[in-house]
């Protein structure tokens, strides 16, 4: 047979190939207990609704920022020199801060008037002293993440009102409540001028 004949036979031949019929894919739906179908929690069904508190005029977040940005307000609005003197005279405070030279500390705080938040290392404030200054709306100290703040001047600026802060004034640490409502807020920056020291037992 010639080569031309062989080529014609090959070109005319049809391959006998059978393709299997497409199969339907079976998709297994996850059971209710699957992590993809976790039951909704109460918190996800009912988001936390907070009652809006009407603040007094001049007590907005911008007003607080303006007030705290002026260094001249530190000893008139936030921490008084009399308060610092009372701390320096307190035997409990003296014992907890024995590493500081009393004369040097007095010079820094009362003569040079260095703000408490700039003292390094921070002053140690005993819980006994903190509790002594938790009187209510007139004077309110608190602990947030181990740091002591005199938030008396901030009370009327608090978006959630004064009552909730006064209600929890005897808490060992307010960080749990703070994170519940203000987790995105930098409290160290917000309350910098209110900083007194770090809590100790």
Curated annotation (Swiss-Prot):
Residues binding heme, per UniProt: 158, 182
Taxonomy, superkingdom: Eukaryota
GO biological process, one term: DNA damage response
Keywords: Heme, Iron, Metal-binding
Record-linked Gene3D superfamilies: Cytochrome b5-like heme/steroid binding domain
GO molecular function: cytochrome-b5 reductase activity, acting on NAD(P)H; heme binding; metal ion binding
Keyword GTP-binding: no
Disulphide-bridged cysteine pairs: none
Ranges where the Cytochrome b5 heme-binding domain occurs: 122-200
Database matches in SUPFAM superfamilies: Cytochrome b5-like heme/steroid binding domain
Database matches in Pfam families: Cyt-b5 (PF00173)
Signal peptide positions on this chain: none
Disruption of the gene: reported phenotype: Displays increased levels of spontaneous RAD52 foci in proliferating diploid cells.
SMART domains, per the entry: Cyt-b5 (SM01117)
Cellular component GO terms, alphabetical: cytoplasm
Classification via PANTHER family: CYTOCHROME B5 REDUCTASE 4 (PTHR46237:SF1), CYTOCHROME B5 REDUCTASE 4 FAMILY MEMBER (PTHR46237)
Additional detail: Present with 450 molecules/cell in log phase SD medium.
Function: Involved in resistance to carboplatin and cisplatin. Is probably involved in a pathway contributing to genomic integrity.
Family, as annotated: Belongs to the cytochrome b5 family.
Protein name: Increased recombination centers protein 21
Origin species: Saccharomyces cerevisiae (strain ATCC 204508 / S288c) (Baker's yeast)
Gene: IRC21
